[in-house]
Amino acid sequence: MILVIGHAMAKPETLHAMLAISVEHVLRSRTEPGCISHEVSADVQQPLRLSFVERWSDLAALKAHFRVEASRAFAKALAGMADGMPQNSVYQSEEIDLAAGRG
């Protein structure tokens, strides 16, 4: 599984617009092949910080997501409104079943 963790800092005057385009992006992305989950949330300690967490079935699905014109337009629009550059980190991961070791 591929895990994407990112964040973007809003300015007070851009927070509402950044949230709106982020929710639209999340809802669209969830319909793409290979998307397991895609979420955006506001940090409770830093309300201007938007956090993104995405889970993709494989790297090919994530690369296809990055090639979607709407994804590219979202990234450009978000960067244009953000206070600084949005950050993204991509990881290859596997889920660990913590209950499997009990017994």
Walk through the language-model features, giving the residues of each.
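N-proximal accessory regions
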Residues: M1-I2, A17-L19, W56-D58
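Hydrophobic packing within well-folded, soluble alpha/beta domains
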Residues: G6, M18, H38, L50-F52, ...
